[in-house]
Amino acid sequence: MAVQGSQRRLLGSLNSTPTAIPQLGLAANQTGARCLEVSIPDGLFLSLGLVSLVENMLVVATIAKNRNLHSPMYCFICCLALSDLLVSGSNVLETAVILLLEAGALVARAAVLQQVDNVIDVITCSSMLSSLCFLGAIAVDRYISIFYALRYHSIVTLPRARRAIAAIWVASVLFSTLFIAYCDHTAVLLCLVVFFLAVLVLMAVLYVHMLARACQHAQGIARLHKRQRPVHQGFGLKGAVTLTILLGIFFLCWGPFFLHLTLIVLCPEHPTCGCIFKNFNLFLALIICNAIIDPLIYAFHSQELRRTLKEVLTCSW
């Protein structure tokens, strides 16, 4: 699996510039002595990937086991876990192949390695795109459940959810394949960045609107009990903290990766950008960390899911 310098290869040429743009392999005198490069050992990549792999496998198995969890909301959560599982699994596979090649335990022809690398790139890219899509889908689902509560079950039906899920997977595979094929075009990188920003804005708008509605509801209840300010302010503060954590984790884990893509287009040869490019492995590790955090935010808060998880762990099928 191709490694450029100290950086692993992901999504074809993402850790290098497209052929139409000068390479990111900046000399030491270009990047300067002040560059901070965070080294991510292969062992850490494997550890993070395996933790995420096991965690998301448990989520998928738990939802599959309990028929009460086969609602549209849990279908989206299950698909998010599957996407995160593929992100982690592809990186575990790539890291394992790199280590085997470096140790001389695996010998393969360059053409074979190139094909394997392309397949892993497509899997990684499609799972990342689908993960972002399902994060947005979960936000939309929760928004409808709050603002259209009486009509929720007629709007978000299981057949519609399945069609949406199928469309997301097909679109993710299709666009990731096109991306790998045309990764030397800056327009492709810009499309990915715009897509990330669109998902971020969508989630922020929906969750902020949901928080505002929840605060209004709490304020109305407080007025009935003549305890307006303490209850309302306490609820609003708790909701704001929760929202900040949710969106903050999303931005901190995904933002650096898409900043990397943006800088490839804007300043491929600038020394400061070159310093940022050196930390590609760190950005990838943050995405894997997000795959570890997602189940804690979206899945394990459910008592029904936690109860079923205990059954899965005790093998009581």
From Swiss-Prot:
Matches recorded under PROSITE patterns: G_PROTEIN_RECEP_F1_1, G_PROTEIN_RECEP_F1_2
Entries under CDD domains matching the protein: 7tmA_MC1R (cd15351)
Intervals, Cytoplasmic compartment: 64-72, 141-163, 212-240, 301-317
Key word Transmembrane present: yes
GO CC annotations, alphabetized: cytoplasm; plasma membrane
Extracellular compartment residues: 1-37, 94-118, 184-191, 267-279
Transmembrane segments: 38-63, 73-93, 119-140, 164-183, 192-211, 241-266, 280-300
Gene3D superfamilies noted in UniProt: Rhodopsin 7-helix transmembrane proteins
Any Pfam family: 7tm_1
InterPro entries xref list: GPCR_Rhodpsn (IPR000276), GPCR_Rhodpsn_7TM (IPR017452), Melcrt_ACTH_rcpt (IPR001671), MSH_rcpt (IPR000761)
MF terms (GO), sorted A to Z: melanocyte-stimulating hormone receptor activity
Lipidation (S-palmitoyl cysteine): C315
Keyword terms, alphabetized: Cell membrane, G-protein coupled receptor, Glycoprotein, Lipoprotein, Membrane, Palmitate, Receptor, Transducer, Transmembrane, Transmembrane helix
Protein's membrane topology: Multi-pass membrane protein
Glycosylation sites: N29
Location of this chain's protein in the cell: Cell membrane
Major localisation: membrane
Biological process, per Gene Ontology: adenylate cyclase-activating G protein-coupled receptor signaling pathway; regulation of metabolic process
Function: Receptor for MSH (alpha, beta and gamma) and ACTH. The activity of this receptor is mediated by G proteins which activate adenylate cyclase. Mediates melanogenesis, the production of eumelanin (black/brown) and phaeomelanin (red/yellow), via regulation of cAMP signaling in melanocytes.
Subunit structure: Interacts with MGRN1, but does not undergo MGRN1-mediated ubiquitination; this interaction competes with GNAS-binding and thus inhibits agonist-induced cAMP production. Interacts with OPN3; the interaction results in a decrease in MC1R-mediated cAMP signaling and ultimately a decrease in melanin production in melanocytes.
Family as reported in the entry's similarity comment: Belongs to the G-protein coupled receptor 1 family.
PANTHER family in UniProt: G-PROTEIN COUPLED RECEPTOR (PTHR22750)
UniProt name for this protein: Melanocyte-stimulating hormone receptor
Phylogenetic placement of the source organism: Eukaryota, Metazoa, Chordata, Craniata, Vertebrata
